[in-house]
């Protein structure tokens, strides 16, 4: 009886993941929600370099650590800049990569997040490096992972950045993190996207709070 129940549970888990097509590379488009800002009440901000400093590992023990389907030491920075997660089988084993669409990168997505955050705070986005307010960004984490469960799957996403802002000659550095978890029944694009969208939304809330506390 117990063996029958276990076999059924394993079969259901396999079917759930199979319905998500976890084999091979998955392409996952991501968007940043936009809301009406306050207008340019605080002037213009120039956003300079957005750098990817995520650390990838070969066969990490935790799914929350970035990895690829292959040898990370042989991957170029350009290839890694597109990877945002790994798929898993019903036992938690790593499968194919999850990547942004061709020609998109974590730097592009993060820049859009930072721009949206500044707009909501009342800044216009400028192109002059000599602007009174300027910012640079270092991406520490931009990753999603999945944890299989008996009756549902947990999709988690984490976006963490170091933000350096210089305003009127004064420089401050902050860490901003957005995190979210989404429970779903199948490893499909919408479930991955819901996790990322919620993490983006949380990031923007934390961004607003961080700048407010800094008087920016």
Model-assigned labels for residue ranges:
Residues 21-108, 212-216:
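A structural "domain/chain start" motif
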Residues 9-18:
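Bacterial N-terminal signal peptides
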Residues 54, 110, 114-122, 143-146, ...:
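Sec/Tat-exported extracytoplasmic proteins
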Residues 1-9:
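Bacterial N-terminal signal peptides that target proteins for export
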Residues 25-30, 116, 120-171:
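Surface-exposed short loop/turn segments
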Residues 50-54, 138-144, 177-181:
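Generic short beta-strand segments
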Residues 80-101, 168-215:
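Short secondary-structure boundary motifs at beta->alpha junctions and helix caps
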């Amino acid at each position: 009886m117990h063996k029958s129940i276990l076999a059924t549970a394993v079969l259901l888990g396999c079917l759930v993941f199979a319905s998500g097509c976890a084999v091979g590379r998955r392409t996952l488009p991501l968007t940043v929600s936009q809301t009406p800002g306050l207008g340019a009440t605080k002037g213009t901000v120039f956003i300079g370099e957005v750098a990817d400093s995520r650390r990838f590992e070969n066969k990490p023990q935790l799914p929350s650590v970035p990895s690829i389907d292959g040898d990370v030491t042989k991957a170029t920075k350009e290839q890694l800049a597109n990877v945002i997660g790994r798929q898993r089988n019903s036992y938690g084993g790593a499968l194919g990569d999850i990547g942004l669409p061709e020609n998109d990168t974590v730097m592009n997505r993060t820049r859009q997040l930072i721009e949206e955050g500044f707009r909501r705070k009342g800044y216009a986005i400028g192109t002059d490096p000599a602007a009174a307010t300027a910012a640079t960004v270092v991406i520490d984490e931009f990753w999603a992972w999945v944890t299989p469960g008996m009756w549902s799957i947990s999709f988690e996403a984490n976006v963490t950045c170091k933000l350096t802002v210089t305003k009127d000659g004064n420089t401050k550095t902050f860490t901003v993190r957005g995190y979210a978890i989404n429970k779903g029944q199948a490893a499909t694009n919408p479930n991955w996207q819901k996790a990322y969208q919620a993490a983006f939304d949380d990031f923007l809330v934390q961004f607003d709070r961080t700048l407010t506390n800094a008087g920016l």
